[in-house]
């Protein structure tokens, strides 16, 4: 990495700090952004924030958010650095309409051939040269904006804030999310479109746009059959779009797999059927598939202790989650800026997983998103050190002192797997534009209202044994679920985690942004024993949790094999 700037002041990155004059990175939290995929395993891309550049002169270009290509094999570029900045010094006339502040996130990603890169909300093009080639210079580099109906990606377009875009491995399609926040709704929908270069306008347009959503009951998490029999239905389980499988033929997303645990799913573009990739991550969203398709690298909250009080009991079906509670549970995963992510290697064959950095410093937390090297032998991810207000002052956790070069609060990690031999990446053919189960989308088209189960009493049979009786209540219009209660009688989907007892969740008002109150009195038996209980008046979460501000009334405690897990302090 470039050295750390002594300060943000102009000129602080002197020749004494970096004799090559190729810049210094900021020491601030998050200054080393997400790594990005490159098709040659000797390199990885990385978004960074430079600081301390002089106001004038050749080194002045190393300023603000930029994208690097970084050597991973211990060698250097001709100037002696292990990195090359590929966006620094690009003339403004060569990048019109591009949001350079997005160079650190979403992650950069190389198109097949490594001559074009997704950087920020644009496509960097170095003509006939790969970006690692010395002949690829700033003057010869163009960054073309990506537009949706004439508006730049990243803007609020058609009522939805476009975010979290990811390049399909086919190099032809892009996926993204639209976050919809109005007075009466808070939702997110996934999209896919084809990148088409408009020569006359010198930009990429997103065409053949499809919303990766279907309002039919066949694509909802639970389906009601005759006699009120409920059936879990893994289809359309994208939730928030998070990327692609290695062959580009399935969208990665997050949805509840067990109650109060938000897991990774792969949903087929051809059929809409979904399969879980993680079994009980508690929460995950940063993820990347190995180029050979055999592994995932998921950043998960399990193992950090953050969500164990609400997510720690396995074997509970995601019934109360259908209120929905997902946004509230996911909000607990952060303490202000602090994320509690840990990197896990996950098998795509059976979901078995292992923490990559077990025994690491818990004050360093993984940051979105990770990436694999192209030969599927190693992974790269960024980490941030906990900083105020998540530590210090009234917080019981003292703020640690960074031991990284220059005292910086971000770092980039590379983990190699000696037992994984180099293997070729899947070479995906372009996927079809049409998604048969999706919804063709035209800008301005109203966002759908997600369907839900109607009020009533239902029965859910365990896949292995037992039953659950489910009671759903709605508001007077039937438009909003206001409460879900469940009674479990020897319920088990896997035959090893057996659930008995009752639980419920309710809105405290007929509003999407209402406080939510949980009542839990559950018992676990089988391979583990435990309880999940709330205080007599329940556990109530403020909607401030949607802004990652933990404010709760009452308590929830989960005990597994004698170990009790309690909630964070308010404000933590």
Predicted regions and their residues:
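Sequence signature of WD/YWTD-type beta-propeller architectures
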Residues: 1-572
């Amino acid at each position: 990495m470039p050295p750390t700037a002594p300060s943000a002041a102009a000129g602080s990155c002197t020749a004494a700090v970096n004799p090559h004059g190729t810049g210094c990175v900021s020491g601030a939290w998050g200054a080393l952004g997400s790594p990005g995929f490159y098709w040659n395993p000797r390199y990885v891309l990385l978004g960074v924030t430079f600081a301390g550049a002089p106001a004038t002169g050749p080194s002045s270009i190393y300023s603000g958010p930029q994208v690097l290509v970084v050597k991973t094999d211990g060698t250097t570029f001709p100037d002696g650095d292990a990195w090359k900045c590929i966006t620094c010094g690009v003339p403004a006339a060569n990048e019109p309409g591009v949001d350079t502040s997005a160079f650190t996130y979403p992650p950069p990603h190389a198109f097949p051939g490594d001559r074009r890169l997704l950087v920020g909300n644009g496509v960097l093009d170095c003509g006939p040269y790969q970006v690692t080639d010395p002949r690829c210079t700033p003057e010869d580099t163009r960054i073309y904006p990506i537009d949706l109906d004439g508006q730049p990606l990243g803007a609020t377009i058609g009522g939805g804030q476009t975010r979290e875009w990811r390049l399909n491995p086919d190099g032809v399609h892009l996926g993204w999310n639209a976050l919809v926040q109005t007075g009466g709704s808070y939702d997110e929908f996934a999209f896919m479109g084809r990148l088409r270069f408009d020569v006359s306008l010198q930009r990429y347009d997103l065409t053949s746009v499809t919303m990766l959503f279907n309002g039919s009951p066949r694509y909802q998490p639970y389906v009601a059959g005759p006699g009120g029999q409920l059936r879990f239905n893994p289809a359309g389980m994208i939730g928030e779009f998070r990327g692609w499988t290695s062959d580009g033929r399935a969208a990665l997303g997050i949805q509840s797999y067990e109650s109060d645990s938000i897991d990774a799913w792969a949903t087929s573009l051809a059929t809409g059927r979904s399969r879980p990739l993680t079994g009980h991550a508690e929460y995950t969203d940063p993820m990347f598939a190995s180029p050979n398709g055999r592994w995932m690298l998921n950043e998960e909250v399990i193992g950090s202790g953050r969500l164990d009080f609400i997510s720690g009991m396995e074997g509970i079906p995601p019934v109360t989650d259908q209120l929905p509670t997902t946004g509230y549970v996911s909000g607990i995963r952060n303490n202000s800026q602090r994320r509690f992510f840990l990197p896990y290697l996950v098998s795509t064959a059976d979901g078995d997983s292992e923490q990559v950095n077990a025994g690491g410093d818990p004050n360093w937390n993984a940051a979105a998103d990770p990436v694999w090297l192209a030969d599927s032998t190693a992974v790269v991810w960024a980490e941030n050190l906990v900083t105020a207000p998540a530590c210090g002052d009234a917080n019981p956790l003292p703020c640690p002192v960074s031991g990284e070069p220059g005292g910086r609060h971000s770092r980039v990690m590379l983990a190699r797997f000696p037992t994984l031999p180099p293997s070729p990446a899947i070479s995906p053919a372009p996927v079809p534009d049409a998604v048969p189960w999706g919804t063709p989308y035209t800008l301005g088209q109203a966002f759908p209202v997600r369907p839900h189960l109607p009020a009533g009493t239902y029965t859910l049979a365990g896949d292995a044994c037992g039953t659950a009786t489910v009671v759903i209540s709605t508001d007077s219009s039937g438009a909003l679920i206001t409460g879900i209660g469940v009674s479990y009688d020897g319920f088990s989907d896997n035959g090893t985690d057996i659930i008995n007892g009752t639980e419920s969740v309710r809105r405290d008002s007929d509003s999407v942004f209402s406080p939510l109150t949980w009542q839990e009195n559950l018992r676990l038996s089988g391979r583990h024993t435990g309880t999940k209980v709330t205080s007599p008046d329940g556990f109530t979460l403020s909607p401030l949790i949607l802004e990652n501000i933990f404010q709760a009334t009452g308590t929830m405690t989960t005990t597994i094999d004698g170990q009790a897990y309690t909630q964070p302090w308010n404000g933590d």
